[in-house]
Each structure stands twice: as structure tokens, then as C-alpha cells.
Amino acid sequence: MKLALLSLIGTALATPAVMLSHKELTAFEKYTNKQTSNSISAVELDRVARKLMHDCSANTYVVVNQPGLKAKDFQTESAFPFLKKLLERTSTMYTVPYADGGIELGKLANSVAKQCGAVKIDVNLDNNITPLEEYMDTTKRVIEINFEPLPNTYVSRLAALAANDEMLEKIVRATPSPFIALILTSQKGEEGDFETRNPDFKIFPGVARAKTVPGAKDKYKYHMELQNVPVDEKKLTAEALLKVKTPPTHAPEVRQTGDGELVDDKLLLMIVGSVVAILLSLLVFNGLMAAKPDVVKVDKTDAKVEKAVKKEVQKKERLVNGRVEQLKRETR
């Protein structure tokens, strides 16, 4: 009987929660740093979630409901590869293994939409290819995701968690902006079974330790690099937001030359262009050279004409002078 009582004391309803924001929220961190235990009440969990989401610094707010989630699920970190990557590349993270119950995520999503002037959009979890239609504008949006309850068997449970993490990645990558705030927990009334609490357990402890290293947060400050595109929040403009995602790169087309070497099409065009330019230059030069003798010939003709005119003038002058002298003699 005594052992049974001790077991009940150590076992209670417990709901884990993971929260993150792209931005370093100093006030939020000061608030959560006051927490001295890895267990909090459901009321406090709701307060922390609203404090994170109502900051309104993000373009996208993702509210994830995973019914039946337990703290021990995070012991297998390999089931959450994308979520872990998000936590590594965000400036603010908060995790709590044990909350005394879930929160009303639907109400949270509605309050964020109202507080931040965001639009709620639906996610089609039945479409495994494109659960969320891509959009290119920067209007703030709240994305509410409601996964199916987790199976009870260990292998099936891990498979479901991994599949949901993959679905979360597809949804997040469909958004145009890397400025994201996210919460993942269980909806009130859909919590997991009672679970023995470990006072030393932490969710993703390695990620949390890495963020305490000096300068670690500056590496990803204000951006997540989801598409390997460094984004600076201060310099990002509305036009640049449309180009956050890396444009597809195409391999250069090549042609096989006679010697068996591959030639890039762009290089080939440059070579052809250079040859054409050289040929045009030669044609222009030859045209100028061909025109030059004609100029000399014209110059020589003009000189002959001028010389003949001078002779004719001199001849006439002599005739006039001779006639004048003759008249003078006759008058004497």
C-alpha cells in the first residue's frame, strides 16, 4: 500500500511543450528564466505561450496540437529532426517537459490573429505533398495544425512522430518568410496518459546548452536560414521578402566538341561574339584603307587643275601686258 501511494505521488498528468521564436525576446527570456522547475501549471503554460505569441514580431505563427504527446517522446530526438533544426536556428527557445494539463490552442490561435492582425489559414493534412498552398505576400498568418492522436505502441508512435515532423517541415517551408513563432504541445482535453515525472529531464538539452555559449545566438540572430539564405531583419524589405527562397539553379548546358572536350554554352557564345566583333573591325578598317587612295587621287587632280588655271591666267596677263605696250608705242 505504501509503495502504491509513492507511485501515485510520482505519477501525474503531464503535458510537454516546445516554443520558439526567430527573434531574441529579452523580456520573454527574463520571464521564463524565473522558472526553477521543469514542471509548471496549465495556467502558467498558457501565460507563457501568450507572452511569446503576442509579441507580434513574426510573420508566421504556427500552433501545433499533438494529442497524446509525452515528455518521454523527446528522449528519441531523432523523431524530431526538423523541430530540432528550428530550435538550433532560432534566437529564443523554451521547453517544459511537464505541465499540469494542456491549453486551449484554438483560443490561443484566435487571440494571436486578433492581437497581431493576422489571418488564419487552414492546413490540409490529407495532402501529403502540399498540405499548405504557398503564398508570396507578407501578411501575418496564423497556421493551426491538429495532428491525429499518437499510437500507444513504441514503434508506431515513433513512426507517427517522425511523419508529423516531416509534415511540419513541409508546412513551414511553404511560408515565404523565415520570421516564425511556434508552439507544439497538446490541446486541453487531449493530453497524454499519466506519466512519471523526472525532475532532471530536459527537452533537447544539447540545443539549450549550445545557446548559452557566448556569441551562439548572434549566429542565427533574426533569421533561421531555412533555405540557406541569410536574412537580415533590419535590411529586409517587402520586395526582398518575395525572394527569400533560393531560386532554382540550373546546370549549364554543354556541347561535345570534336576533341572530346565539353564546352559551356555561355563560353561558346562569348567566343562567337568575340570572333564576330573582330571580323567587323577588320571590315571597317579595310573599308577605310580602300577609301584613302581615292582621296589622294582627288587631291592630285585638284592640284593639276589649279596649276593649269595659273598658267592660263599668266598667259592672259602676258597678252594683256603686251597689248598695252603696243598701244603705248602707237600713240607716240
Curated annotation (Swiss-Prot):
Swiss-Prot/TrEMBL keywords: Cell wall biogenesis/degradation, Endoplasmic reticulum, Membrane, Signal, Transmembrane, Transmembrane helix
Cytoplasmic topology ranges: 288-332
Localization: Endoplasmic reticulum membrane
GO biological process, one term: cell wall organization
GO cellular component terms attached to this protein's record: endoplasmic reticulum membrane
Mode of membrane association: Single-pass type I membrane protein
Transmembrane segments: 267-287
Function: Required for normal beta-1,6-glucan synthesis.
Family: Belongs to the BIG1 family.
Name by which UniProt lists this protein: Protein BIG1
Taxonomy of the source species: Eukaryota, Fungi, Dikarya, Ascomycota, Saccharomycotina
